[in-house]
């Protein structure tokens, strides 16, 4: 079974509390998602492998560390996942970015995929799938399905808020995928929204309804 971790860093929890509030403006919401994503990126990249490299400083030759192993890719689930991309890129600017577009059928609560645009070498990369919400788990499962169909094998899922139902569904469908979240909330309501949650992340990011 893959790792499941709630990242309880004080700065993340403080910013998440502001993010949840109904009074938080679109501008502030967007900035907070970016900031939390960057902080989470720092945490979820802790186990990236390193290798020795010889470099020359102005004073001497020395052996130091650099990232090794697979190159990185960030794959947001559209549209809300876009809000988390820049936070990750501020840490790993050389990472490539793919996109998986989905919308939720409001009657069945099931995701419908409408776009998959990925780096050609996606099968050779460590992938961070990002989406602010892990609700039913349907979108996350479909996104990982799409990646695995294209040969991807090293995948982590990163969200800001998760429901227990979504975590369980993703773990059952893809037990090899690590899941990271800033909060594990209580449940889903009858409309498939996370409680207490933070509302519709896409609408709040982009000022739409």
Swiss-Prot record:
One GO MF term attached to the UniProt entry: uracil phosphoribosyltransferase activity
Broad class of enzyme this protein falls into: transferase
Catalytic reaction(s) noted: UMP + diphosphate = 5-phospho-alpha-D-ribose 1-diphosphate + uracil
Keyword set, alphabetical order: Allosteric enzyme, Glycosyltransferase, GTP-binding, Magnesium, Nucleotide-binding, Transferase
Pfam families: UPRTase
Cofactor comment: Binds 1 Mg(2+) ion per subunit. The magnesium is bound as Mg-PRPP.
Single Gene Ontology BP annotation: UMP salvage
Top-level taxonomic group: Bacteria
Activity modulation notes: Allosterically activated by GTP.
Residues engaged in binding uracil: 194, 199-201
E.C. number: 2.4.2.9
Pathway membership, UniProt: Pyrimidine metabolism; UMP biosynthesis via salvage pathway; UMP from uracil: step 1/1
Binding site for 5-phospho-alpha-D-ribose 1-diphosphate: 79, 104, 131-139, 200
SUPFAM superfamilies noted in UniProt: PRTase-like
Cofactor: Mg(2+)
Record Gene3D superfamilies: 3.40.50.2020
Family: Belongs to the UPRTase family.
Role according to the record: Catalyzes the conversion of uracil and 5-phospho-alpha-D-ribose 1-diphosphate (PRPP) to UMP and diphosphate.
Protein name: Uracil phosphoribosyltransferase
Gene: upp
């Amino acid at each position: 079974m893959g790792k499941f971790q709630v990242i309880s860093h004080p700065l993340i929890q403080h910013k998440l509390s502001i993010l949840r509030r109904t009074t938080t403006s679109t501008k502030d919401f967007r900035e907070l998602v970016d900031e939390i994503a960057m902080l989470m990126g720092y945490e979820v990249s802790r186990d990236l492998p390193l290798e020795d490299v010889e470099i020359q400083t102005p004073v001497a030759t020395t052996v130091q560390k650099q990232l090794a192993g697979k190159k990185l890719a960030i794959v947001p689930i559209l549209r809300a996942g876009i809000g988390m991309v820049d936070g990750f890129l501020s840490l790993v600017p050389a990472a490539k970015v793919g996109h998986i577009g989905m919308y939720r059928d409001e009657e069945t609560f099931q995701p419908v995929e409408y776009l998959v645009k990925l780096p050609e070498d996606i099968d050779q990369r460590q992938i961070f799938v990002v989406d602010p919400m892990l609700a039913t788990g349907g979108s996350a499962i479909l996104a990982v399905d799409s990646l695995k169909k294209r040969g991807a094998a090293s995948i982590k899922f990163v969200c800001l808020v998760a429901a227990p139902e979504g975590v369980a569904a993703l773990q059952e469908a893809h037990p090899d995928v690590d899941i990271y979240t800033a909060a594990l909330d209580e449940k889903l309501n009858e409309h498939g929204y996370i409680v207490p949650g933070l509302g519709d992340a896409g609408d709040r990011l982009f000022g739409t309804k």
